[in-house]
Amino acid sequence: SRGLGDVYKRQPYDRIETDFKMIRDAGMNVIRIAESTWSTWEPEEGVFDFTHLHRMLDCAAKYELNVIVGTPTYAVPSWLAKKYPDILAVTHNGKELYGHRQNMDITNPDYLHHAQIIIEKLMEQVKDYDCVIGFQLDNETKPYDTCSKYAQAKFVEYLKNEFPDIDEFNREFGLDYWSNRVDDWDAFPDIRGTINMSLDAEYKKFQRKLVTDFFAWQADIVKKYKRDDQFITHNFDFEWHDYSYGMQPEVNQYEAAKCMDIAGCDIYHPSQSSLSGREITACGNIARGIKGDNYLVLETEAAGNHPWLPYPGQLRLQAISHIANGACMVEYWHWHSIHNAIESYWKGVLSHDLRPNRLYKECSVIGNELKKYGHRLVNLKKTNRFAVIADNASLTGLNEFKLNNESDSNYNTVFRWLCDALYLMNIEYDVIPADPALFASYENILVPALYSATDDVLNALNEFVANGGNMVVTFKSAFSDEHLKIRHDVQPYIINKALGMQYDEFTLPDNVTVSCGGKSSKARDWMEMVDCTTATPVAMYEHKHWGVHAAITENSYGKGRAMYLATLFGEDTLIEALKLFFGEQKNEFDASYPVVIKRGTNTQGEKIIYLLNYSDDEQTVTCHADGLKKLCDDSTVSAGDCIALAPWDFSILYAD
């Protein structure tokens, strides 16, 4: 059913009854507890005290609140770090010190031994509570750049399994360069010293596998205790650019989630006049793509960081936007603003005075609205015609070989460039891995900077176009193989056939302009000197010397078409190029941003349409379809009717 809730942390004084009653009265029905509480449950080795846990669970049952219990393993107690100093990770930057969270070596056997004990002890305490609906594994887990003796020994075994022939390993990674050759696995050098980007990228891939294995290990422990009606999840997060931005570089979320029942995520974003809905959509689509299904928002801001205090109405719009994107739950980090330590100014629903306030009242509006019609919004299913590929290996590749050393632009910059353009065009899209088995499910695929790819993936993209698909590919695609070895053939490798273009020169733009559809913008960060073979130039570089080369091309190949974007340029120009390629994407309201349209089918088989106003001004849209009704009052909306949307407001329509 509907889910709106909070992460509950202990207070500076006892008010659990007051808090849980307030949570219930606000229409919230879920709390998340127990993560980062290891030292509370086990204040010294072998001494356990779950008094506060039972008080929370008993009170949750009293107020009919559902509970998600987190395993408390992402913050280690001081006694554990003192007894086993090697638990603190050794990284590229040296040895970690005790104090902050997520500073441990997740391959350390002493850490894993004691983590298993506390997980099992916790599970024994909670297994008989009906109010516990699920379990969260750890918290925003990463490998924490562990380069310990345990991790590096596992890496060598991983390589030996991948490359039984050590000579093949040396050839594949180009280790004869700079006298880096390895001829004895037992003499494998410390990975922290490598200058070989292929080897470094392989270690990062291995570190992602450590996270996958860590989750599978925890899930196996939890499964010994969980009931069939309980779920296992995790709060996956994203690359951080002062807020959630794009694909997480340190976790292969597709693989990591295989041991889970439902994917969860933490999405934070700008607010006030900067609230655009972009992060809710881009990161939410990543989350929905992790298991190809609905997901849980296990954390998002109520107030959060200083600039994020929402305008009136924005909190409600944000919650509905998550649900419109396929989320089945929206939880706030956190219930109340805390009074000590590093996140003292990461504001919760309640401020430091713990009194009902504006945000609490707005949460109450959301919660009580969802009581009425949440059952018709939850588990929204989408059938999107567009997909954007997100690829861990390519992300790593562009971290190893930056686009521009003078810029912060990276893989996620290119990923979000395409995603945000689709969003502003009111085109809903899925985010998928570079898995050929998924390509045929879509009519249109966008490929941002697929720097690292196998022959099979590239041939599958050619086949997708040949069979009638439409494909947009950006610069820095098909440049290296899966181990970051640069291809020694025409670039972009293999897919130049579908694209009908090629290049062998590239540089950084210097006063270069790209124009399309009446919009012009400066090229930035990277440009390729593209020559058309069978493609038609859509836009040439506007430059005295580089004007002979194409910046945007379009090609017919088999039954389909392909566009290539040879440089990074302004959003308005990109939107014009995509309109030219895909055609105008009409909707039944002819609405354009800042009115965002999302849609799907609910469990009852009704078509649900969301009209979301992401602006500080009233917006009016005209309906061009019959047979629609407003969810709030069942009033009919017919062709020609106008719907007014107040600032930061929304309307939900349905059709049988």
What kind of region is each of these model predictions?
Residues 2, 27-29, 61-67, 128-133, ...:
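Short, well-ordered coil/turn segments that N-cap beta-strands
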Residues 10-24, 44-58, 117, 210-217, ...:
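Aromatic- and glycine-enriched glycan-recognition loops and surfaces
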Residues 10-23, 244-256, 311-319:
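Short, acidic/polar
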Residues 1-8:
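Short, small-residue-biased leader/transition segments that mark boundaries at the very start
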Residues 17-24, 32-92, 218-225:
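Aromatic-lined substrate-binding rim segments of carbohydrate-active enzymes
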Residues 92-262, 266-273, 277-280:
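Polysaccharide-binding and catalytic clefts of secreted carbohydrate-active enzymes
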